[in-house]
A protein has these predicted regions:
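Gram-negative outer-membrane beta-barrel proteins
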Residues: 24-26, 35-43, 50-52, 80-86, ...
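Outer membrane beta-barrel strand-and-loop segments of large Gram-negative receptors
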Residues: 1-5, 102, 108, 127-185
Length: 185
């Protein structure tokens, strides 16, 4: 089985951002369009891959300065993760008979939404500092590695689009002079 493969990958992205600033408030709104196209041909076989994807990627950023030592920020952005050539190639790699890998030409890009917020307050006279943050992410068409183990203990691994998924974290950091406390979740 030959793994010879010819490919052409093109990627275009363009967009615009609008921003406004005042002494206390700064905001930015953005919108981008992304187009990617992967065309490939398996040498010696009559098989090809032709995947093209277009995505709209909005973004927003807001920062408010309460005073010189305190501010809050909120950020939203979107991004994509295109499948790699290795993930898309319809080949079975059986160099390790206990763990075979098969590409998946039907993968679609993963689309990610990220929302984050943080608050900062610092008193320059007492050196007290408060920093708190929270992040949440939503992924559509997550690309994950599917593993199937047969009765003899052999693994077959293949990338698949899992569907939707969420993730998040939050934390706070409090400092009073030289003493600090940090908590993350």
């Amino acid at each position: 089985l030959s793994r010879a493969f010819e490919r052409t990958y093109s990627y275009l992205q363009g967009g615009t951002r609008f921003s406004k600033s005042s002494q206390a408030l700064r905001w930015v709104l953005g919108l981008e369009v992304q187009n990617s196209d992967l065309q490939g041909k398996i040498i010696g076989r009559n098989e090809s891959i032709d995947n093209g994807f277009t995505n709209v990627l909005p973004s927003a950023n807001l920062r408010y300065q309460f005073n010189q030592g305190s501010n809050v920020s909120v950020n939203y952005r979107t991004s994509t993760r295109d499948p790699s050539l290795n993930e898309l190639q319809p080949f079975v790699d059986n160099t390790d008979p206990l763990r075979t890998y098969a590409g998946n030409p039907n993968l679609t890009p993963q689309y990610q939404h990220s929302l984050s917020a943080d608050f900062r307050r610092f008193d320059q006279f007492t050196f007290r500092n408060v920093y708190a943050y929270a992040n949440v992410g939503y992924n559509r068409n997550q690309i994950v590695q599917s593993r199937v183990i047969d009765a003899q203990g052999r693994q077959t691994v293949m990338p698949v689009n899992l569907g939707d998924g969420w993730n998040g974290n939050a934390g706070v950091n409090l400092t009073n002079g030289s003493l600090g406390i940090t908590a993350h979740a």
